[in-house]
Amino acid sequence: MDKQMLFVYNPKAGKAQIRSNLLDIIDTFVKAGYEVTAYPTQAPGDAVKAVQERRAGYDMVVCSGGDGTLDEVVTGMMKSEERLPIGYVPAGSTNDFANSLKIPKSMLQAADVVVNGRTFACDVGKFNYNIFIYVAAFGIFTDVSYGTPQDTKNVLGHAAYLIEGVRRLPSVRSYPLKITCNGEVIEGEFLYGMVTNSHSVGGFRGITGQNVALDDGLFEVTLIRKPTNPLDINNIIRALVDKRVKSEHIYTFTTEKLKVESEEPMAWTLDGEFGGDHQSVVIESWHRALEIRVPDETE
């Protein structure tokens, strides 16, 4: 009897690449012994619902789209009692998590990894009652991904995120915060903060720290303190471009859990999508909670 696969895909992700590759991708799955049920998402949040309601009776769930689509599929799986391995065929404009896992950019090669690769257990982030895969962030740049028009993302790729972020510099605001982690309390005004489990964010590698492991139960945390003048802002941008993750205004550390409190509700982004306004959040690592298909050579 053939193995059963639920294939959830976003037909609009990236440059709608899935349209020209869909039949070949499904053919790859079928030749590997899977009976495939294809489900094109119709609206934001649709993939969460599809996985929760339809996963029963399947051996694997595969998704194709950007990081947002993967986030929805993982969220649906993590909220289910029975968890299945997940395959990922990237089709977005910036696929940070796929890059960290060395999943090929070629959709057909990624489909081959789904059926011929190996299963890797990696960490998943909890954000209050929500779930994220590789980044939770606030402040400057955090609304760039969901605030950048889809057409711009498609044409410019991850350069679109940097362009949009730089455009917003004149209106930068800071946030008075209290951050509790590792038995310490950090207080101050911050321009930006990100809690990551990835080798890259926004398509830029090396800005999340050194020796990053996706299955060690630890987040890499980066905080950028409030600059006092335009020169400080330039120095911060230069440090990020040069991948100097520790400087006068940039504070980094690792932790498995932290609490972030602000004086008023603050906008967060989860995996590049709007994560809501929150005044108090607890972020913790769900150690090796996600089983995902990766190439054999991925360590």
Regions found by a protein language model. Give the residues of each.
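Glycine-rich phosphate/pyrophosphate-binding beta-alpha loops
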Residues: A137, M194-Q210, F274
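Short conserved active-site loop signatures built around small residues
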Residues: A47, D67, G193
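Gly/Ser/Thr-rich active-site loops/lids in small-molecule metabolic enzymes
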Residues: T152-A159, S200, R205, G209-N229
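Catalytic core of DAGKc-family lipid kinases
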Residues: A32, T41, K79-V195
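ATP/nucleoside-binding phosphotransfer catalytic cores, i.e., glycine-rich phosphate-binding loops
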Residues: C181, E187, A213, L223-E299
